[in-house]
Amino acid sequence: MMKQRKIELLAPAKNLECGIEAVNHGADAVYIGAPKFGARAAAVNSLEDIAALVAYAHLYNVRIYVTVNTILKEEELAETEKMIWELYRIGVDALIVQDMGITRLNLPPIPLHGSTQMDNRTPEKVRFLADAGFRQVVLARELSLQEIRRIHETCPETPLEVFVHGALCVSYSGQCYVSQACFGRSANRGECAQFCRLPFSLVDADGKTIVRDKHLLSLKDLNQSEVLEDLLDAGASSLKIEGRLKDVSYVKNVTAAYRSKLDAIFARRKEYVRASSGTCRFDFTPRLDKSFSRGFTHYFLQGRDREISSFDTPKSLGEEMGTMKEQRGNYLTVAGVKPFHNGDGVCFLDEQGRLQGFRINRVDGNKLYPAGDVPRIKPRTRLFRNFDQEFERILARKSAERKIGVGWELADTPSGFALTAADEDGNRITLSFLYPKELARTPQSENLRTQLGKLGNTPFEVMPLGGTDSPSATTAPVSYTHLRAHET
């Protein structure tokens, strides 16, 4: 028999709203900041919100991981221990931690995951963490496929969590102290000042300026959507989307994009299966180029790559739309390869290489009427759309539905009926009950399917159940309303 490996799509949540939408759009697990001591000080959440997310996620067997991944001070250990117990009591599935001192605390039986802030880039480090009791290890972003495969071969029983999308650090994770040194804000305390996104000038030994005011340390964003199968074959079990500071539309779009990619792989590769329950249906077509990015890179996954930097700007350019033709009065004409919409955000690099932008008030063919002053743009300047009004309008509404398939079988018994329910994961239950019935005047198959299919606002939808048609074509319950009460 083929051994199947569960594959987890792990999505970020800044808050409860983002967490719920991550679940709705296909996440198998969601990671979210604790009330304190997370590596994103601006993304903390109350115990009440985390508990609400746990309750919702567990309907679909989606796991909730809470980040407690800063270096702790001695005087914070007691408070940390108390908080971990509270997280355990509300049903959190695991903690993502950095400080090994946490393992010395009086902990509840809650799984620990080794944060990427631990600098996990060798088989020896992963083996050490596994031997110390860690259930999952988040690998460093800068590893190649070969390095990931070697770690998996050395530690085959340890689930490996690999980043597949989002921002990249120019330094080794957990080993960067430049923010602390320059600004007194430690990345290992959740207060990174984003030093690597600032502009710098490059001056040689003779004082000659080689490059002036460019973002020399700013990297593009990671995008491994086209090489997911390679990552799975190398041993990755958890595919992680970065973005605990991103907004809800980012979470919706990016999670849905990776869910769609993975489901297509699972349809071909039966040795890989998803790690949660339910089927997602989207009211939009996910597009990674529609969400925040600094341009995309595979980073070092397939070896050293020269095209990993975003020197011009650390901000989101978005999708390239065309080029500037000319300015006439209160509008611009463009040579476009894609259509703009009213309300779109447009950006471009001016003659000094600085990022500029404007909002479109009205579009008329290839004419753009900016809201406010008409910007001066040199002909043939590349134009980008970093805000798609139509796409964002779709994402602002309900944009996905997630349902678990369940089948009903109603069987006739001498004293009533037996109602059997089975879901898509193989969970099955039969309830027998006394119930009045009468001889049906017409076949009841379709009527029974209709009545039992009224599942309302639940996580479930009807699916066929194991070759069973109508449980009774000649008898019927006296009251379908009372019968349906047994469904719940």
Language-model-derived ranges and their functions:
Residues 111-113, 118-234, 254:
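Catalytic alpha/beta core domains of metabolic enzymes, predominantly
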Residues 49-50, 59-105, 111-121:
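Active-site beta->alpha loop and helix N-cap motifs at the rims of alpha/beta catalytic domains
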Residues 41-51, 100-107, 142-155, 248-250:
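Active-site-adjacent beta->alpha loops and helix N-cap segments on the catalytic face
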Residues 481-488:
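Conserved small/polar residues in nucleotide/adenosyl-binding loops
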